[in-house]
């Protein structure tokens, strides 16, 4: 669990930024959002397939974009 030690010379903004950075690094917010609603195997598979299609189309777009310059 992330936690910070408050220093005497730190103001609130700096210490809040350090705490927020630690929570982002530990993926606490994303994990909490994922656990908020139960996701079935079919939903996970569907999301994975959509993400893989999106990734493939992005690669194809980049390849075609740089192919025209050659």
From Swiss-Prot:
One of its GO terms (cellular component) is ribonucleoprotein complex. It holds the Pfam family Ribosomal_S21. GO terms for molecular function: structural constituent of ribosome. One of its GO terms (biological process) is translation. It comes from the Bacteria. Keywords: Ribonucleoprotein, Ribosomal protein. Belongs to the bacterial ribosomal protein bS21 family. This is Small ribosomal subunit protein bS21.
């Amino acid at each position: 669990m992330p936690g910070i030690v408050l220093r005497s010379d730190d103001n609130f903004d700096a210490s809040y930024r350090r705490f927020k950075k630690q929570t982002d690094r530990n993926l606490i917010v994303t994990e909490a959002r994922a656990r908020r609603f139960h996701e079935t195997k079919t939903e996970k598979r569907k999301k994975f397939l959509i993400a893989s299609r999106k990734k493939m189309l992005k690669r194809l777009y980049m390849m075609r974009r740089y192919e025209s310059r050659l």
